[in-house]
Amino acid sequence: MTAMILDGRALAKTLREELRADIQAFVQTTGVTPSLAVVKIAGDPASERYTRTIRKGCEDIGIVFYDHTLPPDTTQAALEETLHALSFDRAVNGILLHLPLPPGFDSNRAIAQIDPHKDVDGVHPYNAGLLAMGQPTMVPNTPAGGMELLLRNHILIKGQRATVVGRSVVVGKPMALLLLQEHATVTIAHSRTKDLASVVREADIVVAATGKPGLITADMVRPGAVVVDFGVNVLGDGKVVGDVDFAGVAEIASAITPVPGGTGPVTNIMLLRNVLRAARLQGVGRGE
């Protein structure tokens, strides 16, 4: 068996065109162009690269982009003040705080300053609570992208056994809740799970989100399983790989996401889609 490749780049292209049309319709109806404010602390090259990617994506589909880069010596209070001000700024529809923050900063306190209706990363406790209650509004972008890949490729989820390996609040846990909402029977595994291989082997859908390259190997995956790999790991030679041994698992899985080119491209589109969703939630437009 050779797995079907769940191509994130191709899907992202389709989603981008759909979102572009939705934004144009929103602008025509409301007279408002959706906007995103990115808040970050200077000094992290990876954060700078990500900002450029998001800026380009916004400009491509018609979202106004604001860059709020704070100096490396900024304080917790200054960061919170910036987020608080943006939350009350009617010209800003979405707020994205680059995480993780540098050592010494309290990310929970910072996130709490973001208006939940502007929380396009889906990290505010209010939005996490809605997701847990089965009322998702602003969903974290990475798991939302993974679900989009499954649903758009007509992968059967209802009644299937799904194992999510990883329990982070931004990927593992929300992905488990999204699968549960689609009526899968979900198990969450993690670093302290006994006999991880046997737990994974029971799954019809395997989700890897651990940050450990090659953790999921072919002998751990049942034939015909669907595998979603959220891992992004840079090896010593510069090669980017996932948490799944792609070459081996692709021989026995029925479908698999590659790394790179799988969940990543869709994740960025989910962020931009949340900006439009935020604008709608805020009821912006004519007649305010």
Curated annotation (Swiss-Prot):
Please indicate if the UniProt record lists DNA damage as a keyword: no
Reaction catalysed?
(6R)-5,10-methylene-5,6,7,8-tetrahydrofolate + NADP(+) = (6R)-5,10-methenyltetrahydrofolate + NADPH; (6R)-5,10-methenyltetrahydrofolate + H2O = (6R)-10-formyltetrahydrofolate + H(+)
Q: Which CDD domains match?
A: NAD_bind_m-THF_DH_Cyclohyd
Instruction: List GO BP terms, alphabetically.
Output: L-histidine biosynthetic process; methionine biosynthetic process; purine nucleotide biosynthetic process; tetrahydrofolate interconversion
Q: In which pathway does it act?
A: One-carbon metabolism; tetrahydrofolate interconversion
List all disulphide bridges recorded for this chain.
none
Binding positions for NADP(+) per the UniProt entry? 166-168, 191, 232
Q: Name one Pfam family in it.
A: THF_DHG_CYH_C
Q: Which domain of life is it from?
A: Bacteria
Function, as annotated, reads:
Catalyzes the oxidation of 5,10-methylenetetrahydrofolate to 5,10-methenyltetrahydrofolate and then the hydrolysis of 5,10-methenyltetrahydrofolate to 10-formyltetrahydrofolate.
Q: How does it assemble?
A: Homodimer.
Q: What is this protein called?
A: Bifunctional protein FolD
